[in-house]
């Protein structure tokens, strides 16, 4: 497309009003770090992998109109420098139409901005969303997760995340495999629901997969009220969870 050739030529001062697809626009561009915060993205519906492996990019794009976007899958995956230019304006994004946030911040080493106000009411897939994040530890406890079915590996090896997410509606979730998984002995995830026992209120009645959910995780909250009647795989669920000591007898 014309916009692709202009971007390839290094021309970023573009009229983007009619653009609907931003998939992989800057994927694997290791040198790109130009201000594009002024772009009109009001008609963009898909941003899959837009900055995937764009390892230098760290600009403020918080003013973007994302009201038409339906998928942000892998949008910043492996964008190791991205932190929205140090600005919390990304919290203003309208994500009300987004259904897919799979691996959105996967392996983003620097990102740690408040996104707690995002409307996630239509999101169904959060698999790997914050997996292998070294900095992210923001309050996302108010998110509407009522339609999310997949939370597998969501915080896998998220080395500093420890927030209270006990108010999440998990009634639609079927997969929590590896959700808080660490890498193993000596390398644990710190998740403990922000020190709150509210996670005991989670509706887990639809969850089938809980394999390695708290594997090598410093978790120790009461989850004795969880409904595990649908679970078929709990293999290694608490393996290397050295702190866990709760009554699960029912």
Residue ranges and their predicted role:
Residues 1-250:
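Negatively charged
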């Amino acid at each position: 497309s014309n916009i692709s050739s202009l971007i390839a030529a290094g021309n970023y001062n573009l009229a983007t009003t009619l653009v609907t697809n931003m998939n992989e626009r800057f994927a694997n561009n290791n040198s790109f770090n130009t201000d594009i915060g002024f772009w009109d993205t009001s008609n963009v519906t898909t941003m899959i992998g837009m900055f995937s492996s764009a390892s230098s990019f760290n600009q403020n794009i918080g003013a973007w109109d994302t009201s038409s976007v339906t998928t942000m899958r892998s949008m910043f995956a492996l964008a190791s420098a991205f932190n929205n230019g140090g600005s919390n304006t990304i919290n203003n994004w309208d994500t009300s139409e987004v259904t897919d946030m799979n691996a959105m911040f996967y392996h983003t080493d620097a990102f740690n901005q408040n996104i707690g106000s995002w409307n996630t009411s239509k999101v169904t897939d959060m698999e790997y969303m914050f997996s292998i994040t070294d900095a992210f530890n923001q309050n996302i406890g108010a998110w509407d997760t009522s339609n999310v079915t997949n939370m597998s590996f969501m915080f896998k090896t998220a080395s500093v995340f420890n927030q209270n997410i006990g108010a999440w509606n998990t009634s639609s979730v079927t997969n929590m495999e590896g959700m808080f998984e660490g890498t193993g002995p000596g390398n644990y995830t710190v998740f403990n629901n922000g020190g709150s026992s509210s996670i005991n209120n989670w509706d887990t009645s639809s969850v089938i997969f809980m394999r390695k959910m708290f594997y090598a995780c410093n978790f120790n909250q009461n989850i004795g009220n969880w409904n595990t009647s649908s679970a078929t795989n709990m293999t290694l669920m608490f393996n290397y969870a050295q702190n866990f000591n709760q009554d699960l007898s029912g």
